[in-house]
Regions:
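Non-catalytic, polymerase-adjacent accessory regions of viral genome-replication enzymes
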Residues: 1-46
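Glycine-/proline-rich flexible loop or hinge segments
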Residues: 23-35, 65-76, 103-105
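Short Gly/Ser/Thr- and Asp/Glu-enriched loop/turn motifs at secondary-structure junctions
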Residues: 60-62, 252-256, 289
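Conserved polymerase palm-domain catalytic core
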Residues: 130-255, 260-274, 365
């Protein structure tokens, strides 16, 4: 595919900034944060336009905090100005150019895709393969600390291959480098140490100690809208290699998790070695969880447990997801009954794809 001749001067437009602001507002859960910003809305949006137009925009500091869902994770929240710029970059620079280059089975965070599309593909592939009544194997791979290990320079080189305009590259570089500042790891250390002082189990303390830090010129800020699309794009070369050069028809990737289905276990072993070599070129490596399984013994992907029993496909909710759902519902039942209704509706959509009537009844989800 040819390089994009998208122009920075065309992208930097007040109406695009205004549209991006509206998208940010729509996706902001705590609306009280917007009150002060909205008092001087026109002035704030004009300031963003002027900074971008004069090419002196610089990504600000993150508000860094810890969540547990179910594991401890660091989230890096942007101020409103940076959120609006990131939204504009995502909608008008990244998506129009990157989306057409992605394979159909790269499912995470994309419009009309997500877990539903990944689930449907996995189910479709398994139903097709089981017709031959042969043993089916799955190579299930996981990339080690994916978001934290994405190499900035490798990513920027990839972007230079698809964007001609230097000002666009400079803006993307500015956003990508925003996790390089020394305060980021200091903030994370402070948050972790504060949490460790609480009355926690040994398990949770060990889990906290394993929360990653950012190495210089490595990692994307977790929470940025641009980080999501840059992360699904980073492995695009390998996605095409797996589908086209290795001729893996039954391949699905969901961010840092991937599966390849095949009748031939030895072929999957070879493919695994190729993936390991190709990931090394991207300065990444596979997690220890990566393995090859017989589908009749079952495997878990995107939270579902897929098993072939007597050549019949059985799909259930995975144990980890089941535990997370139970904990969430228990917490919201006590603390936020209004939100509980919305969460249950969301879980119902997720559960109805699997054999989960007993679980739905037990948790009163319908």
């Amino acid at each position: 595919m040819k390089k994009s001749h998208l122009k920075y001067d065309v992208i930097v437009d007040y109406n695009k900034i205004l549209d991006s602001y509206r998208l940010v507002v729509k996706n902001t859960e705590h609306k009280e944060k917007l009150v002060k910003y909205n008092l001087f809305l026109s002035s704030n949006l004009i300031d963003i336009y002027n900074e971008l137009n004069s090419k002196c925009y610089y990504h600000g500091k993150y508000n860094i905090f810890l969540i547990k869902d179910p594991k401890y994770r660091i989230i890096m929240s942007e101020n409103l100005k940076d959120k609006i710029v990131n939204q504009m970059v995502s909608e008008h620079i990244l998506k129009p150019v990157i989306e057409p280059r992605l394979i159909d089975s790269n499912c995470a965070t994309r419009k009309d895709m997500g877990t539903k599309h990944a689930f449907n593909l996995c189910k479709k592939y398994l139903l097709k393969l089981k017709r031959e009544n042969k043993d089916i194997y799955v190579l299930k791979f996981d990339i080690k600390k994916y978001f934290y290990n994405i190499d900035h320079d490798v990513l920027i080189d990839k972007l230079k291959k698809i964007y001609v305009d230097k000002d666009i590259i400079d803006l993307l570089t500015n956003i990508i480098y925003s996790s390089n500042s020394s305060y980021v790891n200091k903030e994370i250390d402070t948050i972790i140490n504060r949490e460790l002082k609480k009355d926690l189990s040994c398990y949770h303390k060990e889990e906290l100690k394993r929360v990653p830090r950012y190495n210089y010129h490595k990692g994307l800020a977790i929470g940025n809208v641009t980080s999501q699309i840059l992360a699904i794009f980073y492995l695009n070369r390998i996605d095409h290699l797996i589908k086209e050069k290795l001729s893996c028809k039954y391949y699905i990737r969901y961010m840092d998790d991937g599966i390849i289905l095949d009748y031939d276990k030895e072929r999957l072993k070879y493919i695994r070695r190729v993936i390991e070599m190709e990931l090394a070129k991207e300065k990444l490596e596979l997690n220890r969880k990566t393995n090859i399984y017989k589908v009749s013994n079952g495997f878990t992907f995107i939270g579902y447990r897929f098993v072939l029993k007597d050549n019949k496909l059985v799909i259930r909710i995975g144990n980890k997801v089941k535990t997370r759902i139970k904990r969430k519902i228990k917490y919201l039942t006590i603390h936020d009954k209004e939100k509980l209704i919305k969460v249950k509706a969301s879980y119902y959509g997720y559960m109805m794809r699997a054999d989960s009537k007993c679980l739905q009844y037990k948790l009163k989800i319908k």
